Amino acid sequence: MKSLSAWLLALALVVSPLGAGLWFNQAYLGWLNESIPDANAYAAAWQETVDGQQQLRHPAVIHWLPSACLCRLLTLPHAVQISAEAAENGFNIYQFNGADRGLGEIRSVLLEPVLGASPTILITDTSGQVRYVGAYSDGIRCASGDSLVTSFIADPQALPSHRVVGLNVQTCRCLSP
């Protein structure tokens, strides 16, 4: 009887992490563009949100990592790293509705439902135009290798002249944080 209990315990210890991993994969890991049907409306809504924040100084890196989003925990180290690099390169650093150390000044904003996929990073140029909005990077921790974000924060003067919407990535995302 003792042997059967030990085997059942061992089986439970093996199956539980597999089940948790499957649940996480189904609930949080996926293609960001599947969650946002209209990239143009998504980008326009973010631009409208930025325009409504008159106190923001540009160029800026803006983080949105809602506290209710499990992916926030995985993305946070990369977001802090991006903030430090961007600040060194002349960007102002902000976070919307957050309170994380290392992510810049906190701004409380009312976000539209269309902005429901997170984590999200925005990069604005000197005139306040959003030049990048989307994922930090691809991968489960939003931090796999160099990304567009890394190249964009290297120099505020070298941002693209058009808006880039970074949704074509498989990453950890929360749909309704």
Residue ranges and their predicted role:
Residues 39-50, 59, 75-97:
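Conserved helix-turn-beta segment immediately C-terminal to the redox Cys motif
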Residues 118-138:
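A short, hydrophobic beta-strand/beta-hairpin element that forms part of a small beta-sheet core
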Residues 62-65, 95, 123:
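Structural cue for short, hydrophobic secondary-structure segments
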Residues 137-177:
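Thiol-/selenol-based redox modules, centered on thioredoxin-like
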Residues 103-114:
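Short, basic/aromatic recognition patches
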Residues 51-72, 79, 153:
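Short active-site neighborhood of thiol/selenol oxidoreductases, capturing the structured segment around
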Residues 2-27:
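Hydrophobic membrane-insertion alpha-helices, especially the h-region
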